[in-house]
Amino acid sequence: MSYNAAYSNNKPINKRIQEAKELVELYKNYIEYFRNKDSKKVISFADLALLKTIKQNMQEHKKANEILFAYPKTFEVHNEFHINWEFPNDSKLGDFPCKSLLDRVMIDHTNKKVVLVDIKTTADVYNFRHSIEEFDYCRQLAYYWFAIYWYFKNELKLDLEEYTRETYIIAVQSHDGYEVKVFNIENQYIEAKVCVIEDAIKRIAWHKDNDLWDHIKEYYEGDGAELL
C-alpha cells in the first residue's frame, strides 16, 4: 500500500489508520470532485455567484417566488419533466411518437389545478413580450400542454378538463443584474396554437408514412408549385 510505504513501519497500526482517516477527511471534497467529474458538471465560482444572484432575484419577485419556492404543499412538482407521448394519428404507422421536456409542472390534485412553468433567458427582459411573438413561444407551450393532456389521460387516468390550467414564462435577463419578470400566458393564446401543432404533427406523420422529405406535402400531391 502506497500509504504504508510513505510512513515508518515503526508507527503503530492504529496511529497510521487514524492519520489515514484524517487525510481522507481533509481531502474529502477533492476526492468527491474526482469521483464525480465525469458524471457531473463542475461550475466555476463565477457561475455559482451568477446562479445565486438569479435565485435571489427570483425569490424577491412576488410571482416567481410563489411558483418556484413558496407554493402550497398540496402541489406535487416535476422539474425537467420528460414525457414520451403519442399524438393520435390515423395512418398506417398509427399514433405519432412525441417527446417533451418541460421545465416545471405543478399538479395540485386537491384543488384541481395544474401550473406549467417555462424559464427563458433574454437579452432584454423589458422587451420580452416581442420575443414571445417573434419565437412563437405560445406554440411551444401548446405542444407542452398536449404532452400534459396525454400524461393525465394515459398515466394518471385522469381528465385534465376537470382541472384549472395556468401557464407562466419566467424571463431572466442574461446580463446587467439578471432581472426577473413573470408573464401569465392566458389559455386563449395557447389554444389558438393548437391547430398549428396538430397541422405540423400531421404533416410530419404524412412525410414519415410516405418516406418523402425533400419537399412539402403539397409539392407531391400537386403540380410542384407552392402557395405563398
Where are these regions (language model features)?
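Short regulatory "switch" loops immediately downstream of catalytic or recognition motifs
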Residues: 56-62, 84-88, 107-109, 146-155
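Phosphate-binding glycine-rich loops and adjacent basic patches that engage nucleotide phosphates
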Residues: 7-17, 100-111, 147-151, 157-167
